[in-house]
Amino acid sequence: MLFKQLFELESSTYTYMLACEESGKTLLIDPVLETVDRDLQLLQEMGLKLTHVLETHIHADHLTGALKLRTITDCKIAGPALDNLPCRDIGVQEGEPFILGSIQINPLFTPGHTDHHHAYLLANNIESRLFSGDALLIDSCGRTDFQHGSPEDLYKSIHEKFFILPDDTIVFPCHDYAGKFSTTIGLEKSENSRIGNNRTLREFISIMNSLDLPFPKKMDYAVPGNELCGKCPDNVPDEKSKICSEDKQG
C-alpha cells in the first residue's frame, strides 16, 4: 500500500492518500477544495489515477474537493450512507467493508461530532491505522455543539469504537492545530485532556459544554456546499467562488 498524509493550512485539515499497488486504485480521504490541484499533481508524479474520494462527515470548516475531483478524474465519491446525499456515488456503513483493490477499509459509525460521522479502520497483520475524522483528535476531540452533535454520543463512540482497539493502533485525525501528525490509541486513552485518563461521562459532558468556541468562519457556506459534495452555494465569498467547480451534469 502507498500512503501519504497531506495538509491544508487554512483549515488545518489532513487529507490522506491510499493506493493499492497491485490494482492501481487510489483513494483520497477528506480532500479540500483549495488543494485539489496539489493532490492531482502528486498523483501524477506517482503515476497514480484517482478512483475514489471518501468523506468522514459533512465538514463545517472547509469546502470538500470531492466534486471538483470527480469532474476532473471521473472518480467515485463515497461517504456515510446516513447522510443520504444524491451527489455521492457510494454510501458506506459499518459492517460493510470498503474495498480498494487489496486494501480493506472498515467503516466505524462514530456519531457525536456530527450525527452521521464515520471513521475508517485499516487493519492487517503488520499494523492498524485509524482515520478518525473529527471524532478523535490528538490530545483533543471534535466539538459537539452543532450539526446535531452530542457529547454523550461522542463519549460512547470513542470508548466503544476507538478505545477498544489495540494500544499501538496509529491514529490519523482530520485536523491538528499544533503541527502534530498522528498519535496512538494508547496515548489518547491515557493522556487525552478531554476524554483520556478514565474521565467519566459526566466530566466529559462538563468539559464539552464549557468550551464556548466560536463557530467555524466558513460554516455558513461550507455545510450547504458540502451537502452538494463541494459545489459552491450562492453565499460563498467571491475569492472562494473562483476555485469552485460545477459538476458535469450541472
Positions of predicted regions on the chain:
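Accessory terminal helices/loops
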Residues: 156-170, 174-250
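Hydrophobic residues in well-ordered beta-strands that form the structural core
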Residues: 29, 77-79, 131-132, 173
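Active-site metal-binding loops of divalent metal-dependent hydrolases
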Residues: 31, 58, 82-83, 113-114, ...
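Active-site HxH/HxHxD metal-binding segment of metal-dependent hydrolases
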Residues: 12, 23, 33-109, 128, ...
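A contiguous binding-surface segment within folded domains or other stable secondary-structure elements
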Residues: 105, 114-164
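Conserved beta-strand hairpin/beta-sheet module of binuclear metal-dependent hydrolase folds
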Residues: 1-49, 120-133, 139
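Short clusters of hydrophobic/aromatic residues that line enzyme substrate/ligand-binding pockets
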Residues: 92, 98, 144-146, 185, ...
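Small/polar loops that bind or transfer phosphate-bearing groups
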Residues: 6, 27-31, 55, 102, ...
